[in-house]
Amino acid sequence: MMQKYQDSSLSPEERASDLLARMNLDEKFGQIQCYNAIDSFLGKSVEKQNPYGVGQVCILIATMLDDVGSAAGLIARLQKQIMESGKHHIPAIFHIETLTGVMVTAATSFPCGLGQASTWDPEQQQKMAACIARQGRAMGISHALAPVFDICRDPRFGRMGETYGEDPTLAAAMGTAYVKGLQDKHRMSACSKHFLGFMAGQGGIHTAQAVVSPRELREVYAKPL
């Protein structure tokens, strides 16, 4: 007999409420765990290693595979094992970096964030993100680690190329367009990154102390988010 949470004709809220009522505390904790799909994860029984289920899988190992078909095959195999091993057959969320495209060999590669911002074209940005979402979902990936909303005003910072640059208004427009393209038709979840003032470290040093006034934090670093 089909349970309510398995009925796709019901709303997500109804299905989630029914499923949560059937899960014990350990199973709920299992859904907030994230595993890296490295050799130690791939080489063991999913059921024995994760008896309470798997919530999310980092699939960066796909960057080491030869093509998108291999990546899709790996994800499908892992997803099948995860769903078959759990009592409630809950699929895991697979995530990967997508700032310049799905980070898999032979997937479409786009310019870096700074290059994207240089177009001054949110409409094209939205189309690019839709393409990324379409390719990611085709491989079984539903969570994108992008866009990067950080504001960077120090060219010494080694990760400046990931950002949309120094202007919070432009970053807000480009990042918002990215999220819309990603989540609209193909429904790939975005992850707005990273933290307020993350790229304001002293000396342009990654993770160095950031000295930022409350006003600058609000008007510059928080604005895109």
Identify the role of each PLM range.
Residues 1-225:
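Glycoside hydrolase catalytic-domain context in secreted enzymes
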